[in-house]
Amino acid sequence: MAAWCIGVERGVLDPDAVTQRARGAVNALALLEHRAGLMVHFADALTGVRHGASEYSTIDTAIAVNGAVVAAQVCADAELSRMTEQLLARAAWTEVVHQSEGKTLLHMARVDRREDDYGAGADEEGWVGAWGMTAEQLTIYVLAAGHPDVDPATARALWQGFERPTGSFAGHTCVHEPGGTLFVYHFPQAFWPFGIDPEGLNWWHNAREASAANRAWCLSFAHRYPSFAAGLWGTAAGLGPWGYVVNGAQPATPPSPHCDGTVPPASLMGALPFLPEQAGAALSLLRGKHPLAWDERYGWCDGINLGAGPAKTGDEGTVPRPWYAPARFGLNKGVSALLGAAALGSTLVWDAYESHPWTARGIDVLGLGRAL
């Protein structure tokens, strides 16, 4: 939904059509199965019924609601605003909060049965995992802090509760995610440019350093992975030649990072506001030399691996055959549009996000500074 607003700003989508589309999307989200206001992660696109044994996800709920918040502000439509408020209010963040080893944390998901996705480690109430690490969850804290049922002290304790390990590679230092996967640094910034927090950590600078470290690490393994040898970088989670894979780079927590040489183009799009020259050069290379990575209707494929598949022999000798993901996932299209637009100077999404009463309240409660 936030990406549709970028389309309006750039004159490629009709404002009234986007308003109607956003109304329909928010209405569909409201009808999805949920637990404590957390939406089911995967649902049948035609019926809205929960798909398989899908979990009820905090982060995917947050991403969807973030989009609704932006659309409500940009479209300035009373009905859309009303439905968005209902989604915001429905999320029972107080039920998601728990204490662990003296820290206030949010669970990651909820399941109905232990046989459900991620259900093996569920507690008696069905809660799974905890956001105890640095990852992509920053906007969840903003949404929770903006909820009137969450007292400010609890909201601030949640922000302070997750681990912030620091690591370096090639002179680039950042607070890092355990697996070193790049998308986690970019996703929160797509909705709002997180700057300096009350502890003095600049999250925008952190994302820049993580991006630079990822690039340096990938290039240091150019001898092993053809994708990196070609000048590509940006290891992250996504579709790979052998299925879904969570790739990463240093800094990471041992024994991470895992890597199979796959690069999601969305990582390079996400890095554009932080490293415009380096990310732009890699995207230009990808666009110019690998036309199969691009689709005129949906844009970049979800992943590229230049060293996957059977080798082929030609005039240049035996070389690996490139693999291009057949899928184009909307999640990656959205973040690519938001951060790509930000790299071109647009602040539409950021301004809209912080202007909504709920998110404005959350940002204020947490004492967060805006980077740009």
Give residue ranges: language-model regions.
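Ser/Thr/Asn(+Pro)-rich, low-complexity disordered segments
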Residues: M1-L372
